[in-house]
């Protein structure tokens, strides 16, 4: 379990950041997909504040072992909500892969929450192991989506790479796409999976690793 500590803490810190951003940009102009989802819903400000409260609660609770499971459950549910909000958009634009990519962006966070939830179960039950496997392979599927999305929008991905970084924008767009593909293979095969997940965390923090088409 000790190997999970850093990832769990970072997972919570990101959730806290989402909560703060939701509170600061409650006018829905924040550059975050989570906030924009509420754009056309009635009483959307109340929903944004509620989401912010869940992010903050879950992000703080997940920092301590005694409350980590409750925090993971709260975060898993809110991320699942955001993932499901993309389903009608996918149905409306089934030929635009970016919509699927946005779903898997959120579902990757659901998968992370599932892993934390299962890891901090009070006993080593079969149910906990099953939830952990679902989270693990769910995340692996999301990594496949990250790879496919960059393949479809390679030029857009390249545009996010600063021009001054050698050897060039397209080089790094192709390189990160290959990195995602190798990580997916590692996760599904179980070989170097821990290393792959750690490198993925760093890769996902880079602006070159995602492009969104509005």
Residue ranges and their predicted role:
Residues 1-27, 43-153, 170-214:
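Extended, low-polarity transmembrane helix blocks
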Residues 25-40, 152-171:
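Membrane-interface interhelical connector segments
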């Amino acid at each position: 379990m000790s190997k999970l500590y850093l990832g769990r803490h970072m997972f919570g810190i990101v959730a806290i950041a989402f909560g703060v951003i939701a509170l600061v940009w409650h006018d829905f102009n924040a550059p975050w997909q989570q906030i924009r989802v509420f754009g056309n819903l009635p009483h959307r400000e109340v929903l944004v504040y509620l989401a912010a409260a869940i992010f903050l609660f879950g992000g703080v609770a997940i920092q301590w072992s005694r409350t980590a499971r409750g925090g993971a459950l709260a975060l898993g549910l809110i991320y699942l909500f955001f993932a499901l909000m993309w389903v009608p958009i996918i149905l409306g634009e089934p030929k635009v892969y970016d919509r699927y990519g946005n779903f898997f962006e959120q579902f990757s966070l659901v998968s992370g929450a599932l892993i934390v939830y299962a890891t901090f179960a009070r006993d080593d039950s079969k149910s906990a192991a099953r939830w952990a496997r679902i989270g693990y392979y769910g995340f692996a599927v999301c990594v496949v989506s990250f790879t496919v999305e960059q393949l479809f929008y390679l030029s857009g991905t390249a545009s996010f790479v600063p021009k001054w970084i050698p050897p060039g924008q397209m080089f790094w767009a192709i390189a990160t796409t290959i990195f995602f593909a190798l990580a997916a293979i590692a996760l599904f095969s179980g070989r170097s999976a821990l290393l792959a997940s750690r490198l993925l965390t760093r890769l996902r923090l880079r602006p070159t690793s995602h492009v969104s088409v509005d």
